[in-house]
Amino acid sequence: MRLEKGMKIKDTLKIMCPGTQLREGLENILRAKTGGLIVIGDNKEVMDTVDGGFTLNSDYSPSYVYELAKMDGAIVISEDLKKIVCANAQLIPDPSIITHETGTRHRTAHRIAKQTNNIVIAISQRRNIITVYKGDIKYVLRDSSVILARANQAIQTLEKYVSVLERVINNLNLLEFQDLTTLFDVVTAIQRTEMVMRIVEEINMYILELGNEGRLISMQLNELVKHIERDGILLIRDYCKEDFEYNEVYEQIQKLSAAELLDLDAIARLLGHTGDPLVDTLISAKGYRILGKVPRIPSTVIENLIKEFRELNSVIEADLDELDIVEGIGEARAKAIKDGLKRIREQILLNKKI
């Protein structure tokens, strides 16, 4: 599984992406060029900063928010976004809280967000932008057309990276069946997989921001990267040293900086191959990835096969009787494994994706 990065901002964006009632209200204020200051949450910390205004406790509606924003004061909305608690309120945050914002509205929003850890939205009257604050986080909501253009550009980049990854994996598949895999081939495949997954993360952020307008991008993304992460994890499992936990190795690879990811030796070290020459070190796959592509073979049987034979090549060379004695494998399943591996090999030789 991917490490969860920027969860605070992701959770915040979910409640105000296009298609939501809150976003509709924000867009109305933006178009009216009135500006506005909205606080999400009516807990004690927030209400202690509120001075004046009038209490409403009215049901939330985008048109109500738009009308109330015509007044100078802030609007406080309940945590569940169902009630407008009060309007035209003056917010008085702790003046000692440091902020580098310049406008009065944005300085107040930043301080309130830091002081209460609630979501505060400042809508600029002159610059016509929506800025979201939560704790120390500041995020400027972009127009859907801008995000859509960037998302489409990212999808095009992803297509090229996936194409390169497929070539690298096809080459690795061929070498695995010939038992000629080098450490260089393995770390290159892992590097390329991680590069693809980082672009996927970026596109997922765009999809989150686009809300219901990001459906087509989401469909394209799912089609492009169906099993890439799963195969990448199995690749790490195939080649990391016995005493290494493959999920921990995957987490460490995700934590590599962009510059470190370009260093193949750094990836090799994480797999447990410190100081080994990449091109000259022959390395055999355990077989989790390839055996996982054989139809109707449970993961427990794959585990038993690898425990018995240690390497993929030994499984490939084993005859039916040798396969039959492995726990969980009868005559029918032994034949299915042999036939499945034969079909996979033929597909690889025809340079087809498996």
Swiss-Prot record:
- Protein keywords: ATP-binding, DNA damage, DNA repair, DNA-binding, Magnesium, Nucleotide-binding, Nucleotidyltransferase, Transferase
Report the residue ranges that make up the DAC domain in this protein: 6-144
In terms of SUPFAM superfamilies, this protein maps to:
RuvA domain 2-like (SSF47781), YojJ-like (SSF143597)
Biological process (GO) annotations held by this record are:
DNA repair
- What Enzyme Commission number(s) apply to this enzyme? 2.7.7.85
Q: Kindly state which reaction or reactions the protein catalyses.
A: 2 ATP = 3',3'-c-di-AMP + 2 diphosphate
- Gene Ontology molecular function terms on file: adenylate cyclase activity; ATP binding; diadenylate cyclase activity; DNA binding
What is the similarity comment for this entry?
Answer: Belongs to the DisA family.
Q: Which HAMAP family match?
A: DisA (MF_01438)
Q: Show the NCBIfam families listed in the entry.
A: PRK13482.1 (NF010009)
**Function as written in the Swiss-Prot or TrEMBL entry:** Participates in a DNA-damage check-point that is active prior to asymmetric division when DNA is damaged. DisA forms globular foci that rapidly scan along the chromosomes during sporulation, searching for lesions. When a lesion is present, DisA pauses at the lesion site. This triggers a cellular response that culminates in a temporary block in sporulation initiation.
* Quaternary organization: Homooctamer.
Put simply, this protein is called DNA integrity scanning protein DisA
